[in-house]
Amino acid sequence: AVRSRAVSIGKALGLPATLLDTVADAAAWHDVGKVDPRFQAMLWDGDRMSADLAAEPLAKSGMPAADLTRRRRALRASGLPHRARHEAWSEAVVERYLADQDSPYEGDKELLLHLIASHHGHARPLLPPVHDSAEHDLEAIIHGKNVQAPLPREVPLSSADRFSRLNQRYGRWGLASLESVVRCADMTISAEGS
């Protein structure tokens, strides 16, 4: 749904096909990092067993947004580290997926990874540092392929260089506009309950 919405927005803005494909892929894969078992437990109201038994990973919790006490309790019970960002995990999974492919990504790989990492407004240029002592890998499925990626252990300072190159390539406002396509698609689909 988010991919389709991003395509609609991108077409309305007149994005060229190759750029539209990259934006669409970012929109499709922006939440793959939510497969982290701790994140799933948080979405399942802190219930790790329900999260482990679920047939599919959740993208959103069923908790009322206004019930902050319940949300905080679920967060504590999940074991997620303070300030953890699923965007970092999504970027790591997609980067591993692309590395495992037989041919290089046809679009702008740097833009793709940046749009995934920045879809909640962070990663401009860096995601916040998180101390995460967990030992598990992230396991996701993209296009029917199992992808296993290690948890990010540090803030990749190379993201700042990537951000600089993307600003040179697309311009400050151009890059911000591309980010807003993914963010707007995600937010509007979420608001509609899809």
Please describe what each predicted stretch is:
Residues 1-5:
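Accessory helical-bundle/CTD segments and flexible terminal tails appended to RecA-like ATPase motors
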